[in-house]
From Swiss-Prot:
GO terms for molecular function: adenylate cyclase activator activity; protein kinase regulator activity. This is Protein LST8 homolog. Keywords: Chemotaxis, Cytoplasm, Repeat, WD repeat. It holds the Pfam family WD40. Disruption phenotype: Cells have serious developmental defects, because they are unable to activate the aggregation-stage adenylyl cyclase acaA in response to chemoattractant and are defective in chemotaxis. GO terms for biological process: aggregation involved in sorocarp development; biological process involved in interaction with symbiont; chemotaxis to cAMP; G protein-coupled chemorepellent receptor signaling pathway; negative regulation of phagocytosis; polyphosphate-mediated signaling; positive regulation of actin filament polymerization; positive regulation of phosphatidylinositol 3-kinase/protein kinase B signal transduction. It comes from Dictyostelium discoideum. Plays a role in regulation of adenylate cyclase and protein kinase B (PKB) activation during aggregation. Involved in both chemotaxis and signal relay. The gene is lst8. One of its GO terms (cellular component) is cytoplasm. WD repeats lie at residues 1-28, 31-69, 74-113, 115-154, 158-197, 205-244, 247-286. Part of a complex, TORC1, consisting of tor, raptor and lst8. Part of a complex, TORC2, consisting of tor, lst8, piaA and ripA. Additional proteins, such as 14-3-3 and heat-shock proteins, may also belong to the TORC2 complex. InterPro entries: G-protein_beta_WD-40_rep (IPR020472), MLST8 (IPR037588), WD40/YVTN_repeat-like_dom_sf (IPR015943), WD40_repeat_CS (IPR019775), WD40_repeat_dom_sf (IPR036322), WD40_rpt (IPR001680). Belongs to the WD repeat LST8 family. CDD domains: WD40 (cd00200).
């Protein structure tokens, strides 16, 4: 089993697996007409989820069999978010059909269905594994309590400006939302009540839509990827910019941190993925092979 799994997906309808040090592609999955929006690798590195339109497909990582191991049907529109419960018991998805769903991985089927009032752009799981937080095109953020099976909180930080991405710190203490106007909103979550959002900061981060925002695993950094072709790295103590990563020639769609928070992988409409050394602020490797925009990246370099 490879120690580091790095994968990208593109508008060319392929998923590619890369050897991070050499930059070589060692496997490519042709998904036909299946458009992929998001990628997520399971914690145990056995499967990769490809969220598309309107299915989510699971592929085995350590095989040359490019047929899906499982397919999850039930959404009626683009699946825009996907992730896994820590122990791999279930998967969650969000879709432009206005729903957030939970799926049983052992007996594929929709376990729960949460109705939002607008197309869902992003959904994340709290580290306590007991809440999902979704963001939609109408500008609403909702907290879904998986124990009570209800929406425990709804907030609208910037009117009807669409929420594009959400991220929660690994300690569960902070949540950040980004939107189509290039703003980020930072809240502290209540220790005993995760439906309590204490506003900390509003950041005018970019002059163009933010497409992805992500905390580093050590929670010291925040990355924002934008349609302005840049990625900005923010210190999470004061939320000031510590680096601007320049190099991509078009929109930067997605990013993923290494487990030690020292590296960042990005994907862009310029058809390329890049590996950035965050100590130097430079791209140390470029992954070239897609023939259209790279809109999703996934990295799992957790110790075995």
């Amino acid at each position: 089993m490879p120690g580091i799994i790095l994968a990208t997906a593109s508008y060319d309808h392929t998923i590619k697996f890369w050897d991070p040090p050499s930059g070589g592609c060692y496997r490519s999955i042709d998904c036909g007409e299946f458009h992929i929006n998001r990628l997520e690798i399971t914690h145990d590195k056995l499967y990769i989820a490809a969220a598309g339109n309107p299915q989510t497909r699971l592929f085995e990582v350590n095989t040359n069999n490019n047929s899906p191991a499982m397919s999850f049907d039930g959404h009626k529109g683009n699946v825009t978010g996907v992730g896994f419960q820590k122990e791999g018991k279930w998967m969650y998805t969000g879709s432009e059909d206005g729903t957030v769903k939970i799926w049983d991985l052992k007996a594929p089927g929709c376990q729960r269905d949460y109705e939002c009032s607008a197309p869902v752009n992003t959904v994340v799981l709290h580290p306590n594994q007991a809440e999902l937080i979704s963001g939609d095109q109408n500008g609403s953020i909702r907290v879904w309590d998986l124990i009570s099976n209800t929406c425990s909180r709804e907030l609208v930080p910037d009117g009807e400006v669409g929420i594009t991405s959400l991220t929660i710190s690994s300690d569960g203490g902070l949540v950040v939302a980004s939107n189509t106007k290039g703003k980020c909103f930072v809240w502290r979550l209540g220790e005993d009540d995760t439906s309590r959002f204490e506003p900390l900061q509003k950041i005018e981060a970019h002059n163009a839509p933010i497409l992805k925002t992500l905390f580093s695993p050590d929670t010291k950094l925040l990355a924002t990827c934008s349609a302005d072709h840049t990625v900005k790295i923010w210190n999470t103590k004061k939320f000031n910019v510590v680096q601007t990563l320049n190099g991509h020639q078009r929109w930067v769609w997605d990013c993923a941190f290494s487990n030690d928070s020292a590296y960042l992988v990005t994907g862009s409409s310029d058809h390329l993925s890049r590996l950035w050394d965050l100590h130097q602020g430079d791209a140390v490797k470029t992954y070239s092979g897609h023939i259209k925009a790279v809109n999703a990246v996934a990295l799992n370099d957790l110790p075995r």
